[in-house]
Amino acid sequence: MRPHHIHHIAIVGSGPSGFFAAASVLKAADASDEINVAVDMLEMLPTPWGLVRSGVAPDHPKIKSISKQFEKTAEDPRFRFFGNVIVGKHIEPAELAERYDAVIYAVGAQSDRALNIPGEDLPGSIAAVDFVGWYNAHPNFHERSPDLSGSRAVVIGNGNVALDVTRILITDPDVLAFTDIADHALESLRPRGIEEVVIVGRRGPLQTAFTTLELRELADIEGVDVLVDPAQLEGISDENAAAAGKTTRQNIKVLRDYTVRTPKPGHRRIVFRFLTSPIEIKGKGKVERIVLGQNELVTDDNGRVAAKDTGVREELPAQLIVRSIGYRGVPTPGLPFDDSSVTIPNTNGRVNGSRNEYVVGWIKRGPTGVIGTNKKDSQDTVDTLMENLAGANDTEKFGADHADRLAEWLAERQPKLVTSAHWQAIDRFERAAGEPHGRPRVKLPNLAELLRIGHG
């Protein structure tokens, strides 16, 4: 027989790991005769979905379609969404831990890794976190306004985010106009000043973090040549590539195809530069050029391959630098934080030293993997959580009206709280705005507009 009382679960963060955790909690409760649950999801923005909305590139609608799974979870009567509420500002972690049976932190990695080189802060040098947020209409970044009038951009990093940034910079804006790219970004891209994007990676082709699909699709961008100097692949045998794994083997095959391509007159260019590190960014009041250093690969005693500076330098004119060398988790006030791993220390998802606080996603394991990686990660944490709930004292902790009191408490702390109904109003407005133009939606780019439409 199912018990009459309910375990109240809070999930802080509404990205993929948060929604996967919510779905896992609800599914586990369905399979249990001992546990009833109610899930409250708390989000700092008025909009849910995390990086699916504000991180996935606009020209990748298939990846964004996972939001349909999240919508299905949100329809469960045991689930509630509360947006525009910031943990550490409006409410504290200790207050959540006191009012909920369990709190799951799915806050991701909200900052970027710095290059730590001279000139990094010059106007025209921007973190990929900011640039991606800007073209995806994240309200925290809509005023960034990067100058895209120059002819050359340098993207530093050899992961998928670097490829996303490159595609947005080089793709015809008339193509992007049918996506959900932010209107302000589309207008900034329309003059098409950028003619060349140079992708710089400190290690070699065997050490890149690209997925093959993203690497290959660069060749499909109309009016753009993808160029790789054959010398950069010298010494890489089929055996070397195969030993590095399936994805790397396929990537090397794609890169080899790019080495034999002949540039076409009038085409824009994407140029790969491996074994190259940024040394200094120069310019008078803005980015004008970047000093690049040539590297060689060395293997340490533990078998790890690292890039070593050879001392050779080159100065390359550039007007835009996008730093895409990784994300960083940031501390949540009131919770432990490990600066070396940029995660919240945990054991099987349970926050170390805590009775009822848990973590999922990037803040649990670091910023690695793709969206789907978070599904198993979240499930593992929920398994730990459900075991703890099953072993807890089976007496009622809160009253029957606790859900109502939680909603009242949140509204008291944040009078501009966004509920599921408010988000649905935003969603309808954005979709309706996009429909006449053949776009999936036109995103509202700032907090005031989101709240105005949401609250009606």
UniProtKB/Swiss-Prot annotation:
Instruction: List, alphabetically, the SUPFAM superfamilies matched.
Output: Nucleotide-binding domain (SSF51971)
- Which reaction does this enzyme catalyse, per its entry? 2 reduced [2Fe-2S]-[ferredoxin] + NADP(+) + H(+) = 2 oxidized [2Fe-2S]-[ferredoxin] + NADPH
Q: List the molecular function annotations (GO) for this entry.
A: ferredoxin-NADP+ reductase activity
What EC number is given for this enzyme? 1.18.1.2
Instruction: Write out the residues that bind FAD.
Output: 17, 43, 51, 87, 362, 369-371
Keyword set, alphabetical order: FAD, Flavoprotein, NADP, Oxidoreductase
Q: According to the UniProt record, what class of enzyme is this?
A: oxidoreductase
Required cofactor names: FAD
The job of this chain, per UniProt, is described as: May serve as electron transfer protein and supply electrons to P450 systems.
Q: How does it assemble?
A: Monomer.
Know the name of this protein? NADPH-ferredoxin reductase FprA
Q: Origin organism of this chain? A: Mycobacterium leprae (strain TN)
| Gene name linked to the record | fprA
